[in-house]
UniProtKB/Swiss-Prot annotation:
It comes from Bacillus cereus (strain B4264). Pathway: Amino-acid degradation; L-histidine degradation into L-glutamate; N-formimidoyl-L-glutamate from L-histidine: step 2/3. HAMAP family: HutU. Transmembrane segments: none annotated. It comes from the Bacteria. This is Urocanate hydratase. GO terms for biological process: L-histidine catabolic process to glutamate and formamide; L-histidine catabolic process to glutamate and formate. GO terms for cellular component: cytoplasm. GO terms for molecular function: urocanate hydratase activity. Coiled coil: none annotated. NAD(+) binds at residues 49-50, 127, 173-175, 193, 239-240, 260-264, 270-271, 319, 489. The keyword NAD applies. SUPFAM superfamilies: Urocanase (SSF111326). Keywords: Cytoplasm, Histidine metabolism, Lyase, NAD.
Length: 552
């Protein structure tokens, strides 16, 4: 991948670079994904998650920008793995962009084949929100991480992480949410990363409190704050596959253990034991096969240490990066003895159609987001947990790129909120349209047996019809852009998932599209979990009037 040193920043204000606000939204969100405040390696088009890109290469990026600038409001741009391949006449209620990223026929759905295609310039890895142009920086995963640690606290620590120590690793675009999520729940956390730049970035954006290169200092500070029952987050420079076994050797057992290193990609995401970043980069280039093998061996040691800590009483869970699968394939037969975070903590929310709903102010004016915060606090005042989240986010979350907000809303709530936002744009309360979207990690848009659909009640973990149906219904209902990806979060061969974005531009047509899309999208989550036999999903469907032909 050619590196290009240029600063990309989404336009602000109400002046259009395109022929309509939906096209403008797509353009601004693509550019926002590559804003240096947002992207991990913008010079390589990498947004987050190892090699999760916004476009296949710089030529494709420019072609997408040019296409969006000339796209009519009754046309649809097709993007294949980060390359614009066609513009067809459609209609005004159709999506302006349809994206398919990283999708491979199952027999060939592995990293080796993907890399062959990538080398030939035929494919890119879109992760989840990188290639679908709706990444908002670390805030995008923050509430989900906060909810996960909050539920762990409710289940195991009397509702708070006060006086507890969490040990984790990985402070990239996704994992970087962990330190703040733990301290928001009152706990102490040591978060390990091998890349000083990642730790520095989290400290700069106030997601992490302090930096150290010393395990001794990290433990001393952690114990001091744990005793005081005060929260602190400590970014520790080092390799988790070395530090965790060392802690096991010393008989030091944290209260909570997880991991968000980029283990989903053994070549580009994980650094083997004994290598600096520079040495790893050289080996990756010179001998990728040896690199991958060393990486897998290190991951196995990492998981062995997590299992040892679990045996000693630590609440241990996988945070969706497929590290257990790698260790299992390397011969560690009890790698799956600790659960994934979705079955352990999140699935009840999915049954209610809840998930990581987000919105972005295209104006670039933070006041537009603060006004929408007030809407949440007013309209959902009976949901104390949600309102607490909004208040904390306002105080503690620094915007990256265009101002944005995330909160978990369920079936019915999303459509209600979308209607209000569109009205606020229409009457001028908000200074420009709002983009409404979500992560692909949602209640009804993913098939990922080692993450979102792990341990489904009926054994349907690997059934991949659901994300396809999700993308289809969102497209026909008028989402502004819709994406279908493969391999996000857990790597090639392990997931299929769909994303959607809808623009609230204040028009009556947008109001109708918002009503349809923000009903069917979370509705798919309720339907998927009803089909799998979850009582809470059945209750939700009956209470909310979701029409499911064979529901009992």
């Amino acid at each position: 991948m050619e590196k290009v040193q240029q600063t990309i920043r989404a336009p602000r204000g109400t002046e259009l670079q395109t022929k309509g606000w939906v096209q403008e939204a797509a353009l601004r969100m693509l550019m926002n994904n590559l804003d240096p405040e947002v992207a991990e390696k913008p010079e390589e088009l990498v947004v987050y998650g190892g090699i999760g890109r916004a476009a296949r290469n710089w030529e494709s990026y420019q072609a997408i920008v040019d296409s969006l600038k000339t796209l009519e409001s009754d046309e649809t741009l097709l993007v294949q793995s980060g390359k614009p391949v066609a513009i067809f006449k459609s209609h005004e209620d159709a999506p302006r962009v349809l994206l398919a990223n990283s999708n491979l026929v199952p027999k060939w759905a592995n990293w080796d084949h993907f890399r062959e295609l990538e080398k030939k310039g035929l494919m890119m890895y879109g992760q989840m929100t990188a290639g679908s142009w709706i990444y908002i920086g670390t805030q995008g995963i923050l509430q989900g991480t906060y909810e996960t640690f909050g539920e762990a606290a409710r289940q195991h620590f009397d509702g708070s992480l006060k006086g507890t120590l969490t040990l984790t690793a990985g402070l990239g675009g996704m994992g970087g949410a962990q330190p703040l999520a733990v301290t928001m729940n009152g706990g102490v956390v040591i978060a390990i990363d091998v890349d000083k730049r990642s730790i520095d970035r989290r400290i700069e954006k106030r997601y992490c409190d302090m930096y150290t290169e010393s395990l001794e200092e990290a433990l001393t500070v952690a114990n001091e704050y744990k005793e005081k029952k005060e929260p602190i987050s400590i970014g520790l420079l080092g390799n988790a596959a070395e530090i965790l076994p060392e802690l096991v050797k010393r008989d030091i057992t944290p209260d909570l253990v997880t991991d968000q290193t980029s283990a989903h990609d053994p070549l580009n995401g994980y650094i083997p034991v004994g290598y600096t970043l520079e040495e790893a980069a050289k080996l990756r280039e010179k001998d990728p096969e040896r690199y991958v093998q060393l990486s897998k061996e290190s991951m196995t040691k990492h998981v062995e240490a997590m299992l040892a800590m679990q045996e000693k009483g630590a609440i241990t869970f996988d945070y969706g990066n497929n590290i257990r699968q790698v260790a299992f394939d390397e011969g560690l037969k009890n790698a799956f003895d600790f659960p994934g975070f979705v079955p352990a903590f999140i699935r009840p929310l999915f049954c209610e159609g809840k998930g990581p709903f987000r919105w972005v102010a295209l104006s670039g004016d933070p006041e537009d987001i603060y006004k929408t915060d007030e809407v949440i606090l007013r309209e959902f005042a009976d949901n104390e947990h949600l309102c607490n989240w909004i208040r904390m986010a306002r105080q503690q979350v620094e915007f990256q790129g265009l101002p944005s907000r995330i909160c978990w809303l369920g079936y019915g709530e999303r459509a209600k909120f979308g209607r209000i936002i569109n009205e606020m744009v229409a009457n001028g309360e908000l200074s420009a349209p709002i983009v409404i979207g979500r992560d692909h990690l949602d209640c009804g848009s993913v098939a990922s047996p080692n993450r979102e659909t792990e341990a489904m009640k009926d054994g349907s973990d690997a059934v991949a019809d659901w994300p396809i149906l999700n993308a289809l219904i969102n497209s026909v209902n008028g989402a502004s852009w819709v994406s279908v990806h493969h391999g996000g979060g857990v790597g090639m061969g392990y997931s299929l998932h769909a994303g959607m974005v809808i623009v609230a531009d204040g028009t009556e047509a947008a109001a109708k599209r918002i009503e349809r899309v923000l009903t069917s999208d979370p509705g798919m989550g309720v339907v998927r979990h009803v089909d799998a036999g979850y009582d809470l999903a059945v209750e939700t469907a009956k209470e909310k009037g979701v029409n499911i032909p064979m529901m009992k």
